[in-house]
């Protein structure tokens, strides 16, 4: 989810939000057909507030084609978002996190077993939706899902001893986040009838902007006015990019930070760890990576028609940078 973003022209913005609403409505309709034993669990988090990023990107990419409101666009957007919602269930179990989208997570409201099954059901529903699309579109969904699961496994296992930790982190970001957003753009553009080059360009743009947004979220979690990290978050084995950069420094402050992040952190020490992170070069270096990904995303814009959709995508790229400033 991201906060509401102005896309410029009011009518264009209204059309985009109508497209997102159709996707959300289809998701709710499909999940409402679940057996009563799991209906409440699988519907959790669908309407958690904010603008769902993957449906937004699907609908924006669809504006490049001649049929942006086609049913295939809605089905594809719903399938991708359901896959994302499924991973939220599984991620929170792995992370032992009690919040998701600023809402108590499935594993907190119910149990880990319930959360895993709810995630599985969302994946199954996504597959059912994707099966309504043509074989090429179905293949895009399947390949994105395979890449996503690979990223989840890579994140869970951690980097091998010979792999640079930052290189590992960025690869995971591309696999876990970039994969679905790239697929959102590719499907939105392809199913609305956009040209082949535009489809390729918007898919690459999506991968870059997805990475930028993911890192921005990691930065905001540390540097925001109301930082969202708990002691459990900070003590996780999987550190975020600002943390990884901060831990590479060789200073007394970094030595203390390394000591704090070596294991579970008592909540009494969270403020100290956040202060050390905020005073380190880690946040600035992570912001530079966000800017680099945003620049790569902008490189794709000249290959898209100079119309409102392109300007809206440019706004989205700018938002990725400004969000963490």
Swiss-Prot record:
Keywords from the named record: Lipid biosynthesis, Lipid metabolism, Magnesium, Metal-binding, Transferase
Binding site for Mg(2+) 1: 91, 95
Entries under Pfam families matching the protein: polyprenyl_synt (PF00348)
InterPro entries, per database record: Isoprenoid_synthase_dom_sf, Polyprenyl_synt
One GO BP annotation of this record: isoprenoid biosynthetic process
Knockout consequences: Invasion of the infant human brain microvascular endothelial-cell monolayer is significantly decreased in transposon mutant.
Catalytic activity: isopentenyl diphosphate + dimethylallyl diphosphate = (2E)-geranyl diphosphate + diphosphate
Listed cofactors: Mg(2+)
Induction comment from the UniProt entry of this chain: Highly up-regulated during the early stages of invasion of the human blood-brain barrier.
CDD domains linked to this entry: Trans_IPPS (cd00867)
Cofactor binding note from Swiss-Prot or TrEMBL: Binds 2 Mg(2+) ions per subunit.
Pathway per the UniProt entry: Isoprenoid biosynthesis; geranyl diphosphate biosynthesis; geranyl diphosphate from dimethylallyl diphosphate and isopentenyl diphosphate: step 1/1
Motif range (DDXXD motif): 91-95, 217-221
Entry's Gene Ontology molecular function annotations: dimethylallyltranstransferase activity; metal ion binding; prenyltransferase activity
EC identifiers of the protein: 2.5.1.1
Disulfide bonds listed in the record: none
Biological function: Catalyzes the addition of isopentenyl diphosphate (IPP) onto dimethylallyl diphosphate (DMAPP) to form geranyl pyrophosphate (GPP). Is probably involved in the biosynthesis of decaprenyl diphosphate, which is required for mycobacterial cell wall synthesis. Could be required for host endothelial-cell invasion and/or intracellular survival.
PANTHER family xref list: ALL TRANS-POLYPRENYL-DIPHOSPHATE SYNTHASE PDSS1 (PTHR12001:SF69), GERANYLGERANYL PYROPHOSPHATE SYNTHASE (PTHR12001)
Domain notes: Contains two aspartate-rich motifs, designated as FARM (the first aspartate-rich motif) and SARM (the second aspartate-rich motif). Rv0989c contains arginine in place of the second Asp in its FARM and first Asp in its SARM. The primary role of the FARM and SARM is the chelation of the divalent magnesium ion cofactors that assist substrate binding and catalysis, but it may also play a role in determining product chain length.
Family in the record: Belongs to the FPP/GGPP synthase family.
UniProt protein name: Dimethylallyltranstransferase
Organism annotation: Mycobacterium tuberculosis (strain ATCC 25618 / H37Rv)
Gene: grcC2
């Amino acid at each position: 989810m991201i906060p509401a973003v102005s896309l410029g022209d009011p009518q264009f913005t209204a059309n985009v939000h109508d497209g997102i609403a159709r996707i959300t409505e289809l998701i709710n309709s499909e999940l409402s057909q679940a057996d009563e034993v799991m209906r409440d669990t699988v519907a959790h988090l669908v309407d958690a507030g904010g603008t769902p990023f993957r449906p937004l990107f699907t609908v924006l990419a669809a504006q490049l084609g001649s049929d942006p409101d086609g049913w295939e666009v809605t089905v594809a957007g719903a399938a991708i978002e359901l896959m994302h919602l499924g991973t939220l269930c599984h991620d929170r179990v792995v992370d032992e996190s009690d919040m998701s989208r600023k809402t108590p997570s499935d594993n907190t409201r119910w149990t880990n077993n319930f959360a895993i099954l709810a995630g599985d059901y969302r994946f199954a529903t996504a597959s059912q939706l994707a099966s309504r699309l043509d074989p090429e579109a179905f293949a895009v969904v399947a390949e994105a899902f395979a890449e996503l699961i690979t990223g989840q496994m890579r994140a869970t296992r951690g980097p091998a001893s010979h792999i640079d930790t930052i290189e590992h982190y960025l690869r995971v970001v591309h696999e876990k986040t970039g994969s679905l957003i790239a697929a959102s753009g590719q499907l939105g553009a392809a199913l609305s009838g956009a040209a082949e080059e535009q489809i390729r360009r918007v898919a690459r743009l999506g991968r870059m902007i997805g990475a930028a947004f993911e890192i921005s979220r990691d930065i905001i979690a540390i540097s925001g006015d109301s930082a969202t990290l708990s002691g459990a978050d900070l003590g996780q084995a999987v550190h975020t990019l600002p943390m990884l950069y901060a831990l590479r420094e060789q200073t007394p402050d970094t030595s203390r930070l390394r000591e704090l992040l070596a294991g579970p952190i008592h909540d009494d020490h969270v403020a100290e760890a956040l202060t050390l992170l905020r005073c380190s070069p880690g946040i600035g270096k992570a912001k530079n990576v966000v800017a680099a990904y945003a620049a790569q995303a902008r490189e794709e814009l000249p290959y898209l028609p100079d119309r409102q959709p392109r300007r809206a995508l440019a706004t989205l790229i700018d938002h990725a940078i400004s969000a963490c400033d």
